Amino acid sequence: MSEATPFGIYLHIPYCKAKCRYCDFYSAPGARGVPQSYVDALLRELAKNTRRPDTLYFGGGTPALLVPAQAAALIEAANPLPGAEITLEANPDVVTLETLRGFRAAGVTRISFGVQSADDAQLRRLGRTHTAAGAAQALAWAREAGFPEICGDIMLALPEYTNAEFDRTLALLRDGGCTHISAYLLKVEPGTAFYRNPPAGLPDGDAAADFYLYAVQQLEAAGYRQYEISNFARPGHEGRHNLLYWNCSDYWGVGPAAHSCVGNVRRFWPDDVQGFIAGTVAEQREGDCTSEDYLLMQLRLVSGLNIPAYERRGGRFTTAQRVFMRQCVGHGYAVWDGEVFRLTPAGMVVQNAILEELM
């Protein structure tokens, strides 16, 4: 592959202070930092790569448990291209102004905070370990540290949720200088504390859809342009790394539970942090990237599915599916100009049902 072809690297940092009650990601809770042995294992794998990335993403877990010197070593080993986007996820309560300055000096260009809510009781219910005031402080420190991109997450349709809670959370992120906001619905996944003991007051599907549509409206009004189902940005501040996923470009994941798609081949690492450190586990082939993957990812984007590009990947819509697509337009779920089929916010609410008909 040419370096002109977009390429990103994802580094999984599974360590976190505590497991949130809704989290189904592979993680190692109870950590106060990231063991150097784990960083060394990442460096070992990065040394095998010869392709310089356009984006580098530290995900977790809580990557901000790294010390800046560890992050700097990993960034240097990844050898990103000039102007690369380098993202680090953080919880508000694990950073200080000093550590944020250290991450910025190490080369991180984009800091992403899991704020979720401006309601302290809600944060406790979720199992989060920060407060709304702590989130506001972390955002202020990020501005002072000089990050050009500051991102915040909002969870929607939480227990006992109201639009007023969303408004307060949006105000916290907007006033905190966020250039990018992710807003996504709570999903109660198997294996989570919420699945074992569901919280009272969860909104039903119709109410959750209303919360989502309200969030889209308010984010747009606040100057955050929607570009993907759950992602909104000031113009020019869209997340470049996740766009690699949604455009089915090449990305390489490193670390336990990390996934890759390079050269149309999907691979993954087993959920085994000790095996990864010891070098006794290896990436496994998961399958090929298909035209259905492309359809699934492209319909997440506001820009929609380019049908000629889909057909070049081997995809085809039947006559019945094209009739269904026209029905989606008639119901206000989609816009279709013949070449590009894209979902409206109302269509994004029922995206899964639409995909069932098109795949």
List the predicted regions and their residue ranges.
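Local cysteine-cluster metal-coordination motifs and their immediate loop/turn environment
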Residues: 14-27
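A short, conserved structural fragment
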Residues: 329-339
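Hydrophobic alpha-helix feature that most strongly marks membrane-spanning transmembrane helices
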Residues: 300-304, 333, 359
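Short, amphipathic alpha-helical interaction segments positioned at domain boundaries
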Residues: 346-359
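Minor-groove-contacting beta-hairpin "wing" of winged helix-turn-helix DNA-binding domains
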Residues: 340-344
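Short amphipathic alpha-helical interaction segments
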Residues: 315-329
